[in-house]
């Protein structure tokens, strides 16, 4: 089988169409064309054509992988998954990954370090969440342990406290005790340990004093009483107290406030 002509593709000047015996047979990257010294008149066997096609698949996949990496650093698993989605064959993926590693495009330790630092600075995630994400990205346990150790206790507490303050601002209608529990629960879900979450919750709510809680309680009582005024006095009182307890106020605190402020649920005559 002889190459009878070679033409440059119109849409991609770095790819060439190869014609065998006057008929289009396959196309190759410019680098593959030069490597195999493809030219008009060259005779190729079927085995050699298959070899060239495989080499071109690797070259094409390598170009795609480099473009994929141009947007941000990736882990080896992310690149492998991407190439699979591009329908690359297994042999090509392995060879592409080896070439990328030789070119220093893949370094899972550097990726993990950069990813962890970025998450710490920009997302305020806890260490457990970052660990889980690194596992999903295919990092080894050894690498994960190494990079997570760089997330100091001081940095964790600082980030957890910042998160706690955000949570507190979104839930400023609850009693201090309930608010602290909400903060602890949310911080644990964000990847912090329960011990650190408790410290951060205490730190974030440290400036809330008795006067602040009394003001919150007053507003909640007024709001709840308006909502329940259509009920009989005894039922309205019960519903109001229940609602306030659900927001974290203790029964004794509610009763004391009602008594001290002479708040009655009896109908006015």
UniProtKB/Swiss-Prot annotation:
UniProt keyword Hydrolase, yes or no: no
Family assignment from sequence similarity: Belongs to the RecX family.
InterPro entries listed in its UniProt record: RecX_HTH_1st, RecX_HTH_2nd, RecX_HTH_3rd, Regulatory_RecX, WH-like_DNA-bd_sf
Chief localisation class: cytoplasm
HAMAP family per record: RecX
Subcellular location: Cytoplasm
Name listed for the protein in its UniProt record: Regulatory protein RecX
Task performed by this protein: Modulates RecA activity.
Gene: recX
Coiled-coil annotated residue ranges, if any: none
GO biological process: regulation of DNA repair
Species: Listeria monocytogenes serotype 4b (strain CLIP80459)
Keyword Cytoplasm recorded: yes
Keywords of this entry: Cytoplasm
Entry GO CC: cytoplasm
């Amino acid at each position: 089988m002889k190459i009878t002509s070679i033409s440059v593709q119109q849409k991609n000047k770095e790819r060439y169409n190869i014609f065998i015996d006057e008929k289009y047979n396959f196309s190759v990257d410019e680098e593959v064309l030069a490597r195999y010294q493809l030219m008009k008149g060259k005779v190729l066997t079927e085995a050699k054509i298959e070899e060239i096609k495989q080499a071109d698949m690797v070259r094409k996949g390598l170009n795609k992988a480099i473009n994929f990496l141009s947007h941000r650093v990736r882990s080896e698993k992310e690149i492998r998954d991407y190439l699979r989605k591009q329908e690359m064959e297994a042999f090509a993926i392995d060879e592409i990954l080896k070439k990328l590693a030789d070119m220093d495009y893949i370094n899972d330790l550097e990726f993990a370090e950069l990813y962890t630092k970025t998450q710490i600075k920009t997302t305020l995630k806890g260490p457990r969440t970052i660990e889980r994400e690194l596992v999903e990205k295919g990092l080894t346990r050894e690498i994960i342990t190494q990079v997570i150790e760089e997330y100091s206790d001081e940095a964790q507490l600082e980030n957890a406290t910042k998160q706690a303050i955000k949570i507190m601002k979104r839930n400023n209608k609850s009693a201090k005790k309930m608010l602290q529990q909400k903060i602890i629960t949310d911080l644990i879900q964000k990847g912090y340990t329960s011990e650190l979450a408790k410290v951060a919750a205490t730190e974030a709510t440290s400036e809330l004093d008795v006067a602040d809680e009394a003001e919150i309680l007053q507003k909640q009582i007024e709001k709840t009483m308006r909502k329940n005024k259509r009920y009989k006095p005894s039922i309205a009182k019960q519903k109001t107290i229940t609602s306030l307890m659900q927001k974290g106020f203790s029964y004794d605190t509610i009763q004391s406030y009602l008594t001290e402020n002479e708040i009655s649920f009896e109908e006015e005559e």
